[in-house]
Amino acid sequence: MKNRYLKNARIPERKVRELLNLFCEDLTATQIANISGVSRITVNAYLKLIRTQIAQYCEEHNPYYHGNRLNQIGTDANHTSENHFYGIFKSEQFIYTRNILNPDNVWLNNWVRGKINVENEILVQNDLHIYEAIADFSRAKLFRVNSGSHFTKGRSKIDEIDLFWGIMKSRIVKFRGLNSSTTYLHIKESEFRYNNRNADLFAIIHALIQKRPLHYLRQESVFF
């Protein structure tokens, strides 16, 4: 079956567009499967590829993007099961997130909880100086950065990071928690949805897929 979005696909292009449209409506895989008549296994496979496409888009638009980050997307996702810390910062009216890879978890836990102070030089070496907040997804808690080496205590005034975190927590509840293997993709999806909340999501994602078809992201473990 000819399908420009995915080679050797078993569903036609119109069905892929339907899945994408339902995805943009922020429905769950079960809801999409029930509406489209496509099996949940196939829906989940497509959603994973779509979310990976979105993650690449987010990485490319991150102010601290480095070209090799695209090759680390799978690595980021795999590290999530071991590390649940994500840095959050705002730049030019947009919210960005980054997985904090390979930190000393004991040191990081103590730092974000205000138990220890850290020299700014160490923060710069670990790329932690750029964040306005750090989210701990293992506990669904957000720690706000007050200054270079300290964290705030108590509730800060509501700003865009608070709004983004509220949306992120709502998604955690909606999906009844996040599987450790897909946490990274859901976080990037939330970042994408928040930064493009007033845009046509379907048009953006469809253009991405047309430029880079899903079969470029396909993995051996994905079934169609």
Language model: regions and residue ranges:
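Residue-level recognition of single "structural anchor" positions
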Residues: 1-224
